[in-house]
């Protein structure tokens, strides 16, 4: 955080960096009485004192100072004051989908910077998808040689080497961001199956969907497929220090499993009810493998739509499909005492534009006011159930959302979501919040972020989301 302070705060002022044992103009003090990730900034006539209980708190103090000095290039005067600030939730996350569309490393860093600036502490990196496998796995080179280039779109070829990923992890660590990798299983596996068809139920070549997903998922009946996935997780765990590994689990159609002799045999051998129970069994095998490595497994809420084979106690559920299933996954997860991350697609999926575009019909649009006033995830957190860890928001790259389109989908709506993740007190009325957003717009644009329309009525007929 001191490097961040020098780069983002002192560089805008005439202050010179010099460590002193006493009489410093800016003092950094560890104060264990402050909440985790909380901080206090006290401004005296001759001195600024910054206190925090941990690295996260100091990092967020720097991010606050960064906004205070925004636009300044010379001397700055602060009024004497005291500010104490701390987060509402322990899980504040941004998801970036690099599976469907590959982004340059500079782009990944840009959105890690953004997450830290908005006082988030997790970056959920969606690295595997039907349209692309983006993480180098040394034991299985064809995952990236073949699976990294199956897409035909503008930005659908490419992958990240393990060395590049290590650099990104360190870049995030310096900004108090933990990167949570997602290796999606058993569904959204077409890119992997294009490289290794034997991992599917019938061992046949697979077609790569231009969007959505197909019946081609990892076979849960083959021991070889389970060994493959565990070997992949070995390399993922060696690479990522995160205590959490996301294993996907969403949108896994069971048509092939229902016809597959290996899957039918597995259901009989394990005493399972059906293919839905088989997915629970499969998920439990993967979660238990992560447990043996001291990690927790996150699954999308689809895995708890049906009761059945129990998941282990290192399981976390991410509730997402509010549009299709309302709060079913949230309720079932809480019933089984699984911790929950709230990311209801209404209104945290920021690939949903403000107005219709391509496959996003009017029913899949929302604006800043919708987010601020009607977010089901915000309302769930307000219930203060200790099982609810916090909130995540997402930028999926369905329908060809390329790098140049990302900012205008995120901003300004992500500012409402970051406010809900962090702020515990009474919310401002929307009009006042919107005025604050407009006041801060120039600074975010100076920091390199492009704003899109905030409200539906702001969107002109000729506005181009792409």
Outline where the language-model segments fall.
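Generic recognition of stable, solvent-exposed alpha-helical segments in well-folded globular domains
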Residues: 4, 110, 160-167, 224-231, ...
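Short glycine/serine/threonine/alanine-rich loop segments
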Residues: 15, 120, 177, 295, ...
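Conserved beta-strand edge residues that scaffold enzyme active sites
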Residues: 129-130, 185-187, 304, 347, ...
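Active-site neighborhood of glycoside hydrolase catalytic domains
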Residues: 192-198, 206-316, 320-337
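Contiguous, structured surface segment used for ligand recognition
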Residues: 1-89, 405, 421-455, 463
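Flexible, acidic glycine-rich loops studded with aromatic residues
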Residues: 297-302, 309-466
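Feature activates predominantly on carbohydrate-active enzymes
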Residues: 34-246, 260, 285, 289, ...
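A structural preference for short, hydrophobic beta-strand core positions in alpha/beta folds
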Residues: 17-19, 181, 299, 342
């Amino acid at each position: 955080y001191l490097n961040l302070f020098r780069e983002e705060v002192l560089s805008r002022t005439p202050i010179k960096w010099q460590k002193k044992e006493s009489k410093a103009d800016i003092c950094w003090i560890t104060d264990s009485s402050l909440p985790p990730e909380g901080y206090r900034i006290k401004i005296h006539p001759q001195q600024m004192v910054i206190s925090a209980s941990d690295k996260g708190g100091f990092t967020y103090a720097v991010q606050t100072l960064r906004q205070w000095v925004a636009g300044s290039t010379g001397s700055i005067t602060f009024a004497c004051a005291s500010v104490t600030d701390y987060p509402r939730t322990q899980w504040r996350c941004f998801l970036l989908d690099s599976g469907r569309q590959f982004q340059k490393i500079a782009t990944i860093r840009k959105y890690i910077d953004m997450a830290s600036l908005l006082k988030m502490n997790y970056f959920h990196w969606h690295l595997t998808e039907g349209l692309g496998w983006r993480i180098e796995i040394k034991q299985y080179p064809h995952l990236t040689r073949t699976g990294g280039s199956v897409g035909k779109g503008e930005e659908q070829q490419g992958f990240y080497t393990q060395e590049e990923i290590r650099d990104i992890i360190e870049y995030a660590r310096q900004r108090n961001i933990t990167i949570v990798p997602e290796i999606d299983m058993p569904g959204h596996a077409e890119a992997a199956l294009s490289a290794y068809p034997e991992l599917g139920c019938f061992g046949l070549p697979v077609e790569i969907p231009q969007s959505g997903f197909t019946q081609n998922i990892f076979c849960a009946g083959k021991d070889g497929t389970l060994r493959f996935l565990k070997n992949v997780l070995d390399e993922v765990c060696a690479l990522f220090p995160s205590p959490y590994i996301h294993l996907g689990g969403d949108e896994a159609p069971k048509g092939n499993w229902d016809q597959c002799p290996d899957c039918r045999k597995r259901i009989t051998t394990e005493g399972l009810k059906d293919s839905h129970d088989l997915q629970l069994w499969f998920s439990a095998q993967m979660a238990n493998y992560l447990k043996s490595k001291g990690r927790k497994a996150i699954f999308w809420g689809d895995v708890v739509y049906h009761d059945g084979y129990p998941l282990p106690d290192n399981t976390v559920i991410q509730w997402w499909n509010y549009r299709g299933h309302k709060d079913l996954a949230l309720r079932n997860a809480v019933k089984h005492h699984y911790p929950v991350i709230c990311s209801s697609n209404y209104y945290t999926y920021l690939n949903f534009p403000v107005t219709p575009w391509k496959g996003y019909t009017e029913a899949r649009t929302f604006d800043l006011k919708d987010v601020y006033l009607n977010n089901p995830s915000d309302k769930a957190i307000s219930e203060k159930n200790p099982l609810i860890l916090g909130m995540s928001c997402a930028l999926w790259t369905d329908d060809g959302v390329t790098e140049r389109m990302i900012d205008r989908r995120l901003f300004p709506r992500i500012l409402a979501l970051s406010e809900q993740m962090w702020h515990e007190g009474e919310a401002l009325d929307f009009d006042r919040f919107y005025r604050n957003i407009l006041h801060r717009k120039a600074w975010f644009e100076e920091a390199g972020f492009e704003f899109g329309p905030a409200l539906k009525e702001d969107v002109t007929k000729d506005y181009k989301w792409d």
